[in-house]
């Protein structure tokens, strides 16, 4: 049993180290670079062919929901989320109150941990991912145990 726990801890430590390394690559990105990256993330799952493949895989793997619902979530929710946040400032000075001599700076936090629910594993990881990357963070998404 303790070997299983040790192996799990080592596995998680490796994931976190790899995620930190990935985050370091984007922590100095400009707003334009961040926005291009999250656009690419959404396109990678919502593009023709891939959205269908993910929807079918989700149905086969979870035996929950229906294909059309999964496909539409990938197509609509990922794009809608992108449109909701694409114009938000997330790099550098994001708010300024000169009369009080206050500036609010956006700064990456690092590695974020998240769960993907078994009922919505097709859109949730990319939506959580674009929110994390918008702040120049990395994310590890784990499936919810079923």
Where are these regions (language model features)?
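N-terminal Rossmann-like NAD(P)+-binding subdomain of aldehyde/semialdehyde dehydrogenases
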Residues: 1-102
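Conserved small-residue-rich beta-alpha loop and adjacent elements
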Residues: 85-146
């Amino acid at each position: 049993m303790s070997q299983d726990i040790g192996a799990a801890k080592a596995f998680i430590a490796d994931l976190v180290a790899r995620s930190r390394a990935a985050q370091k690559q984007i922590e100095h990105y400009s707003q334009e670079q961040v926005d291009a990256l999250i656009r690419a993330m959404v396109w990678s799952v919502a593009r023709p062919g891939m959205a269908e493949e993910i929807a079918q895989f989700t149905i086969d793997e979870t035996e929950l929901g229906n294909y059309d619902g999964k496909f539409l979530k990938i197509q609509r929710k990922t794009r809608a989320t992108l449109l909701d946040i694409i114009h938000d400032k997330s790099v550098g000075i994001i708010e300024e109150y000169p009369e009080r001599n206050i500036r609010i700076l956006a700064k990456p936090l690092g590695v974020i941990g998240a769960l993907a629910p078994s009922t919505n594993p097709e859109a949730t990881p990319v939506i959580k991912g674009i929110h994390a990357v918008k702040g120049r963070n990395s994310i590890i998404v784990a499936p919810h145990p079923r």
